[in-house]
Curated annotation (Swiss-Prot):
Gene name as annotated: rplX
A GO biological process held by the record: translation
Family statement: Belongs to the universal ribosomal protein uL24 family.
Protein name: Large ribosomal subunit protein uL24
A Pfam family: ribosomal_L24
GO cellular component, as recorded: ribonucleoprotein complex; ribosome
NCBIfam families: rplX_bact
Signal sequence extent: none
Organism taxonomic ancestry: Bacteria, Bacillati, Cyanobacteriota, Cyanophyceae, Oscillatoriophycideae
Length: 115
């Protein structure tokens, strides 16, 4: 008997709600907010980045077709966390607060992301 394997989940450096900057690809330099993370494929959906169009057929008679736009996922290795205060992208490090909580900190600015 074979065991059913659960899909591999990758540890990602970004979380939903983070402000990031795209560092490679067609949308290089764009800054946006992470709307969704997909840990199984290590991808993120970012607001205003990698926008695709989809032509939707009419579902009912008399209804007209539409052209829908949506944000497609991009790989998490193509994004860096972005400091809105300093206007700079940075890698992250993990540090502990005085209370003993583990938080993410931007290496360039020292700004703590997790509040």
């Amino acid at each position: 008997m074979s065991k059913k394997k659960s899909p591999q989940r990758y540890k990602m450096h970004v979380k939903t709600g983070d402000t990031i900057q795209v560092i490679s690809g067609r949308d290089k330099g764009k800054v946006g907010e992470v709307l969704k993370t997909i840990p199984t494929t290590s991808e993120v959906v970012v607001k205003g980045v990698n926008v695709k169009t989809k032509h939707v057929k009419p579902q009912q008679e008399g209804e007209s077709g539409q052209i829908a736009t949506f944000e497609a996922p991009i790989h998490s290795s193509n994004v860096m966390l972005y400091s809105t205060k300093e206007q700079v992208a940075s890698r992250i490090s993990y540090t502990f607060t005085e209370e003993g909580r583990k938080v993410r900190m931007l290496k360039k600015t020292g700004e703590i992301i997790d509040s």
